[in-house]
């Protein structure tokens, strides 16, 4: 299933489970370095929302000296993390379960991360990427940022 998605993603990262936190830290750091506005939104699609949340939270708290978590909101199938970089730059990180992805239509995000954890199969196909996820990144916040990144 994951290999079918390769051709629809700008970047594909194959990582060991032990390197997840450092990889997520590097992804957040790259976004921070290459964005063009002082605000932005990142969307993580995953089959295991708690595992992805735990990884992102640990990456921010442990390694991101310049980023602070201001607010965390949890609702069924979604987690919102409001972050502050420096004094005034705001980033919203949305972690969404791979269920009912038609709901994202109309959102605007800078990058979409498809997080395939371990051996779990994610409920995403080429139609969802083309019709729902790719249009979200139309107003991408930086010409050097990839639109869709697959992490497995």
Please describe what each predicted stretch is.
Residues 1-152:
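Phosphate/NTP-binding elements of NTP-utilizing enzymes
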């Amino acid at each position: 299933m994951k290999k079918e998605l390769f051709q629809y993603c700008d970047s594909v990262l194959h990582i060991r489970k032990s390197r997840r936190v450092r990889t997520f830290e590097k992804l957040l750091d790259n976004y921070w370095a290459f964005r063009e506005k002082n605000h932005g939104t990142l969307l993580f699609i995953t089959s295991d929302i708690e595992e992805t949340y735990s990884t992102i939270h640990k990456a921010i708290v442990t390694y991101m000296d310049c980023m602070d978590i201001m607010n965390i909101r949890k609702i069924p199938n979604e987690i919102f993390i409001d972050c502050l970089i420096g004094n005034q730059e705001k980033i919203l990180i949305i972690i969404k379960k791979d269920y009912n992805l038609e709901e994202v239509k109309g959102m605007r995000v800078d990058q979409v991360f498809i997080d395939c954890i371990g051996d779990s199969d994610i409920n995403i196909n080429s139609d969802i990427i083309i019709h729902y996820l790719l249009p979200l990144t139309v107003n991408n916040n930086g010409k050097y940022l990839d639109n869709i990144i697959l992490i497995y």
